[in-house]
Every structure is written in C-alpha cells, then in structure tokens.
Amino acid sequence: YQGGFIWDYVDQALMKADEDGVLHMAYGGDFDDRPTDYNFCGNGIVYADRTISPKAQEVKYLYQDLRLIPDACGVEIENRRLFTDTSDLEFIWLALRNGEPIHTERFCARVNPGEREYVSVPAPAFTEPGEYVYQVSAVKKRAELWADAGYETAFGESGRVIGAVGAGAV
C-alpha cells in the first residue's frame, strides 16, 4: 500500500482575537501579512488545537483494508488484506429510512485475502416511500494491542430513494 501519504498531520495556525475579542484559529493572511499562502498551512487531518477534523474520517476510509458495499439485501465484502481473512471481525448492517434506524443485523463472514463475497442479510422488503441509507461496519471481535474489542476498522454506505420524497421528509 504505497501512495496517499499525509503531508501535514496538523494545521499550522495560531490563536487570534477578532474585533469582538472572540478567539479563533488564524493562518495565512489573517495577520495582514503580504505576500501570503492563505490557507495552504490549514490542510492537516487534525486542527491546530489538536481536535479531529472531518478529513481524518476520510483518511480512515481510504486506508481501510476492506471495501464494503451495502445494499437493501446485504453487503459485498472485498478483503484487500494480503494475508488475513475476516474471521477476526463482526459485521453490523444497518438500514435507515429518512435518517431513522429501521433494521439492524449482526453477522460474521470469513472472506479470504484478496477475495470478495456477497453476504445476504435477513432484512424485510423496504417499500414505503423515503430515502433509504444502508450502512455496514466491520468491528474487531477481540481486543488487540492497538484496538479495543468493538473498534470499527472499516465501513461503507449506500442509499436509494423509493417513491416521491418531499424536501421536508428527508
């Protein structure tokens, strides 16, 4: 797995008070310095105050060693690991309708390294109009030196709309 390296782990910014005395993280031209690189130094996966940014979740997704593609009936599991099957994981499949959970299934699946398998889940037919989102997570069955039991190592999501859905319903 080469490529996609993290250049800046943390944003490079300083605390600064605005005209109302409210503190915020400032960088680039925020100090009236010219020339400036503007937000070039604000591209880390954690903010300058060390809180996690949304980019960290994207990095986790891109680096995960499984590809999970859920749908209304199950999930396709692609094991991108080189030597290990998926027997160390439990999978949690979740269906949401208009943002509300409506069905969950937990299961185990053994997919060998470099292989893919579709696993069906015993879910009801979803026919009511609405926006449906299908999510799946792979979590550790047992604690490891680097992760607690239940730690999510991979995730996937897909969705579809059934029938006409008004903007207020979604």
Regions found by a protein language model. Give the residues of each.
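Intrinsically disordered, low-complexity Pro/Gly/Ser/Thr-rich segments with frequent PxxP/GP/PP motifs
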Residues: 90-129, 135-146
